Regions:
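N-terminal secretory signal peptides that target proteins for export/translocation
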Residues: 1-7
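Intrinsic disorder/low-structure terminal segments
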Residues: 3, 14-18, 210
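Bacterial N-terminal signal peptides
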Residues: 9-23
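Conserved functional micro-motifs across diverse proteins
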Residues: 29-221
Length: 221
């Protein structure tokens, strides 16, 4: 049975220790970890817990990205932590993760997560944006741009901050950022869910039930 926990809803407070694994995980201090978890939406079942926190505060991007901010380019970074409490290694198919956005009662859209290369292309694309213009539906993918030294520096920052491993060892966790191009429509996040459809317990060769985590339940950050 799937269990969904939101640590800011129904007066329920969850305190989850974060065990970061080696050089594949981000290493925030204990106070930052606790603040992050308090602002996260979580879902847990079958030994896997996924916590997510959308970054909607531009200051967070300034601390992490010194070259170019994904936020300024209309993207949202979603901090995600995969915690494996089982005795089996878990493999997450990062390429299949989506941001499911509810535009209206009758209209929904799935937005692909971007690789660091795709995100760098979006950040460095030429031309001014017309933020006031309606952007429905949100296009899939981004333009190809020249990949010079500047592009390489931007891509490296995005890659270093991203989720850098898809296999989570038993009783460990992996944390990083996922990137979604919402074309500066950050208000959509209150009606969005992070959809993680493909996680496999490797030794048992058993697929887990999908995760669908409501970003509207995460605290504003």
């Amino acid at each position: 049975m799937r269990k969904v926990y939101y640590n800011l809803a129904l007066k329920l407070t969850l305190f989850l220790p974060v065990f970061l694994s080696g050089d594949i995980a981000l290493r925030p201090c204990a106070a930052q970890q606790q603040a992050s978890l308090k602002a996260s939406a979580l879902e847990s079942h079958e030994g896997m817990t996924i916590s997510v926190r959308p970054w909607t505060d531009p200051a967070l991007y300034k601390e992490k990205f010194h070259k170019k901010s994904p936020y300024a380019a209309g993207m949202v970074a979603v901090q995600v932590n995969f915690r494996n409490d089982s005795d089996d290694s878990m493999k997450v198919n990062l390429e299949r993760i989506r941001l499911n956005v509810t535009l209206s009662d009758e209209e929904r859209q799935a937005i692909d997560s971007l690789t660091s290369e795709q995100a760098a292309d979006v950040i460095l694309k030429p031309g001014a944006k017309n933020i006031g213009k309606s952007r429905f539906p949100i296009p899939i993918g981004g333009p190809k741009v020249g990949r010079d030294k500047k592009w390489t520096e931007v891509e490296e920052e995005l890659r270093q901050a991203g989720v850098r491993a898809s296999v989570i060892a038993p009783h460990s966790s992996v944390e990083g950022l996922l990137y979604f191009d919402v074309r500066s429509q950050f208000e959509l996040l209150s009606n969005s869910k992070l959809y993680v459809p493909d996680i496999v317990a490797l030794e048992k060769n058993h697929g887990l039930m999908f995760f669908e985590i409501d970003l509207g339940q995460a605290g504003a950050q």
